[in-house]
Curated annotation (Swiss-Prot):
It comes from the Bacteria. The keyword Metal-binding applies. Residues 1-229 are annotated as: 2-C-methyl-D-erythritol 4-phosphate cytidylyltransferase. It catalyses: 2-C-methyl-D-erythritol 4-phosphate + CTP + H(+) = 4-CDP-2-C-methyl-D-erythritol + diphosphate; 4-CDP-2-C-methyl-D-erythritol 2-phosphate = 2-C-methyl-D-erythritol 2,4-cyclic diphosphate + CMP. This is Bifunctional enzyme IspD/IspF. The keyword Nucleotidyltransferase applies. Bifunctional enzyme that catalyzes the formation of 4-diphosphocytidyl-2-C-methyl-D-erythritol from CTP and 2-C-methyl-D-erythritol 4-phosphate (MEP) (IspD), and catalyzes the conversion of 4-diphosphocytidyl-2-C-methyl-D-erythritol 2-phosphate (CDP-ME2P) to 2-C-methyl-D-erythritol 2,4-cyclodiphosphate (ME-CPP) with a corresponding release of cytidine 5-monophosphate (CMP) (IspF). Its cofactor is a divalent metal cation. It comes from Brucella suis biovar 1 (strain 1330). PANTHER family: 2-C-METHYL-D-ERYTHRITOL 2,4-CYCLODIPHOSPHATE SYNTHASE, CHLOROPLASTIC (PTHR43181:SF1). 4-CDP-2-C-methyl-D-erythritol 2-phosphate binds at D236, V237, H238, H262, S263, D284, I285, G286, T360, T361, N362, E363, F367, R370.
Amino acid sequence: MAAGRGERAGQSAEGPKQYRLIGAEAVLARTLRAFTDCPLIGTIAVVIHPDDHALYRRAVPEKHENVILVTGGPTRQESTRLGLLALKDEAPQYVLIHDGVRPFIGQDLLERIIANLTPDNGVLPALAVPDTLKRAAADGMVETTISRTGLFAAQTPQAFPYAPILDAHEKAFAINRTDFTDDAAIAEWQEIAVRIIEGSADNTKLTWAKDIEMADKRLRQDHAVFPDIRTGNGYDVHSFEPGDHVTLCGVKIPHEAKLNGHSDADVALHALTDALLATRGAGDIGTHFPPSDSQWKGAASRIFIEHAAKIVREAGGRIANVDVTLISEAPKIGPHRAAMTQALCDMLGIAADRVSIKATTNEKLGFVGRREGIAAIATATVIYPGEVPE
C-alpha cells in the first residue's frame, strides 16, 4: 500500500515519504524488493496515488514481471479494496497486505506469516505492548491505568484467505463503512479468524520525518554506500561544406562554412547525446536515429539530446554535470558560450553551473588544424537511484 500522502512526515522535494531516500534508495523500492525476492510470493499489486506514476517510475526503474500498478482511492481502506480487486482474475488462495513505508520487513517474518496461513484463519504479526498504558481525561490528567496483558501493537503484512477478505472489504464499501484502522479490524468485523504471531522489532513503520532520518542513518551505518554515479563519454566529428553558419549546442553561429551531416550536424549535441546514452548502456545516437532513416534529414539535434535525457530520467537518473569540449580553429566559441550554455540548460533542465563548454584548437595539426571540420568530446555524469551492487 503506497497511495498515501504521508503528511505527518512533512514536505519533501522527493515527494511523499514512500519515495524519500534511505540509504540512497527510495523507501518503496526497498519495501518492494523484500517481496520480489521472496520465492513464496506470486503477483504483487502496488497501489499508488493517481498523481505518483512518475515518482514510482523514478523510485522503481526496474521492471518486474510479477508486479502490477494499481491506482488507489481517497483512503487507505479504499486503496486496499482496489488492490484486492486488481487480483480478482487471478483469484489467489491467500493475500498479504503490507504498508509501503515498512521497508525493513524481513524474509524470516514473511515466511512465518505464510506458514501460519490456513483457509480458516488470517495472520497478524504483532508485538506485545511493553510500556505501561494510561488513559487521559479531557483535561490531560491521568484517568486510569490500562492493563497491558493481552495487548499487542499490530504490524503488516497482514495475511488472509483472499476471497473472505475481499468480500469483507466489499461489504464495508457497500454500506460506506470507512472507520476501520487496519485490515485485521475488517476481518474481525466479518468474523474472520486472525492468528497473532510474533512480529519483528525491525519492521517499523516510517511515520514521521525523524523516522526517515533514523532509517537512512541505520542503512548507512550497516554498510558502506556506493552511490550509483555513472559517467559517459561521447565523441563526434563533422566536416565543413559550403554555407554561412554552424550550429553548436543548438545555437546558430555565423561562419564561412557549415557542417556537413544528415541532420543539422550539431557536433556538440551529437557527442553529448552519446555521453548520456552511455550512462544507461543504451547504444549510441545511430542506434536511435539511424542516418539511413530519411525522417532525420536536416533534423534539429535537440531532438536527439532530449530523447537521451528522457531515457536517463525514465530510469530515475539525475543529470549532475555535462562537459563539452569543442576542437576547432574557427569559429571562435567564446562570444557564444553563454548562449550555448543556456541552450543546454533548457534542453536538459539543469542549472548553468552544471554545464561546462570549452574550446581548444588543434594547433593547426590534422584535419581540424587544416580547418576541414570540427570535433567534439563530451562527458556526462548522472546519478541513478540505489547504489553500485557488490
